[in-house]
Amino acid sequence: FVREKSNLAKTTYFLNASYNLKINSRWFLKVGFQDEIMGLDLNYKTKEQLFAPEKQIWDYKSSTNLVQGYAHIKYGFSKNLTLNAGLHANYFLLNNSTAIEPRFGLVYNVSQKSSFNFGYGLHSQLQPINVYFLQSIDNNGNTVYNNKNLDFTKSNHYVIGYNLQPAQDWRIKTEIYYQRLYNVPVNTFSSSYSMLNTGARFNTELEDNLINKGTGTNYGLELTVEKFFSKGYYGLFTSSIFDSKYTGSDGVERNTAFNGKYVYNILVGKEWNVGAGKRNKTSIDFKFTNAGGRYYTPIDVASSQTTGREQLSTNVYSSQYPSYTRMDIKFGYTFNSKVKKLSQTFSLDIQNVTNHKNVFSQSYDDRNQNVSWKYQLGFFPNFVYKIQF
C-alpha cells in the first residue's frame, strides 16, 4: 500500500544580456550574463501503510536564482588555426555555491574540406531542483533540509575530433571524448547510490543525506555521416560506442544505469515533385534506431515474496535490458496552391513498424509473486494533417 499526494510546480523566467565586439580581423570578444529565476511550489506527501500517518517529503513555496556570467574570445592565429577560449561562472543563490569554468578549443583547417579540433572544458551542473528541498525531522522534532547545501556536480571534458567534406552536400565527423565527473552527490554512509543514475527508474528521488563525494567516468567514440538535403533526398547516420561508470560512497566502481555501450541511428528520406506543374510533393522518410539496453538492479524475488513488497538485489546495476530496436516509416503528400501561399500536407507516420517489444521497466507483482515487465510503445500509426499559409 503506497499513497502519494503531490504538487510539484516550477515556473522559470530568464533575464539575458550580451555584448559583442569585433576588435579587428583576428580578435572577437563576447561577454554576457543570464539570470534564471525559478519559482517553486513543491508539495509532496507519501503514506506507505493504511493507518500510518502521512510523511511530508516536500513543503516549499518560494523562489531562487541561478546567475551565470561568461566571457568568450576568438583569436585567429592564421587562416588555418583558430582559438576559442573563455570563462563561465555560476552562482546559486539558494546556498551561495559558485563554480568558475575555464574552457578552450582549437580548430586547425588542414584544407578547405577537412579540419581537426581539440577542446577542453570544465562544466558544472545543478542537482535536480527538488533534491535541495527534501525535508526530514531531526531528533528535536525540527524540520531540516539535509541536501540544501549541495554543490554543483562538475566534470572535466576533453574532446578530439576530425571533420571531412568528401563531396558536395556530404559531411563526415568523428570525435573521441573523455569525461571525468566529480562532486557527484552520494550518500553520507556507505552505499551504491549516486545522483548520476537519477531518472533511470522513473521514480521520485528521496535520498536526503547526500554529500558531494562521488565520481564518474564517461568515454567514447562517435561517428556521423551526413548527406544534406539536395537533389530530392537526404541521409544521416550517427553512431556511438561508449562506456559509462560511477563510484558511490562505498568506493565500488559500477556501470551507470545508462551504460548501453553503443547506439546507432539511420535516417533517410526522398521527395518527388508531382502533379500539374510539379507543384505538389510526395515523400517517404525512414528511421531506424538500435541501442544497447540499460543496466538495472534485478528484483530479489525471494525477498519480495517474504516481505510482500518489492526488494531489489544487492547486485546493483548488474543486469542489462535487451537492446532497444525501433523502425519508423512516414509517408507524406503536400498540395501547394497555384494562386495562394497555401499548402496542405497529409502524412501517415507509422511508428515501431515491426512492433518490437522494448523494455520500459520492471516491478514486483505481489498478486502473482513474480517480476512484471512494462514495455514501451508498440506499433502505432499516426495520421497528421497540416495546413500552412
Per-range role (PLM):
Residues K22-R26, N80, K113, D169, ...:
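Short loop/turn motifs that connect adjacent beta-strands in outer-membrane beta-barrel proteins
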Residues G235, G277-R279, T289-G308, Y324-R326, ...:
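C-terminal beta-signal and adjacent terminal beta-strands/loops
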Residues Y178, F202-G293:
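Gram-negative outer-membrane beta-barrel transporters
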Residues T46-E48, L93, K113-H157, Y178-T204, ...:
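Surface-exposed extracellular loop regions of Gram-negative outer-membrane beta-barrel proteins
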Residues V31-I37, A85-A89, F118-L122, T174-R180, ...:
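Transmembrane beta-barrel strands of outer-membrane/channel proteins
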Residues L8, T12-S18, I57-Q68, D151, ...:
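Outer membrane beta-barrel strand-and-loop segments of large Gram-negative receptors
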Residues F1-N95, K173, L236:
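Face-selective signature of the C-terminal outer-membrane beta-barrel domain
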Residues A9-Y13, K61-V67, T98-I100, K154-Y158, ...:
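Residues that define the transmembrane beta-barrel architecture of outer-membrane proteins
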